[in-house]
């Protein structure tokens, strides 16, 4: 009984190690110097070095001003787009996507038709064909 438990514990440890090792990305796997030298396709000197520079107060202020200018220009552009007032629909018709229960008049759009659902409890004007 103790031998089987020891064997199962060893198998469990091996599986845990194998699972953890197989999920490491290729660049995080352990390598020795010989494998780095022999692998000519990956040369660490080919990659450019990364330099980190701290921003001074002046550059921070400039970037803030640029961000504020972008925000204000977006607000101005949105304010310039004024919604056109809709033309009032004539009384004897129903607008698209509005309720059109049977006592109501026909739909205003010639391509739309009145569709009812749920035993004619919810009816609305809908456009069926895009080519119309």
Curated annotation (Swiss-Prot):
Disulfide bond among keywords: yes
Molecular-function GO terms, alphabetical: melanocortin receptor binding; neuropeptide hormone activity; type 3 melanocortin receptor binding; type 4 melanocortin receptor binding
Entries under SUPFAM superfamilies matching the protein: Agouti-related protein
Composition-biased stretches (Basic and acidic residues): 61-79
Domain Agouti: 93-132
Residues covered by region (Disordered): 61-87
Compartments where located: Secreted
PROSITE patterns, per the entry: AGOUTI_1, AGOUTI_2
Record-linked Gene3D superfamilies: Agouti domain (4.10.760.10)
CC per GO annotation: extracellular space
Any single Pfam family the record assigns to this protein: Agouti
Glycosylation sites: 39
Span of the signal peptide: 1-22
Protein's GO biological process: adult feeding behavior; epigenetic programming in the zygotic pronuclei; generation of precursor metabolites and energy; hormone-mediated signaling pathway; melanin biosynthetic process; melanosome organization; melanosome transport; positive regulation of melanin biosynthetic process
Subcellular location, principal: secreted
Reported function: Involved in the regulation of melanogenesis. The binding of ASP to MC1R precludes alpha-MSH initiated signaling and thus blocks production of cAMP, leading to a down-regulation of eumelanogenesis (brown/black pigment) and thus increasing synthesis of pheomelanin (yellow/red pigment).
UniProt protein name: Agouti-signaling protein
Organism of provenance: Macaca mulatta (Rhesus macaque)
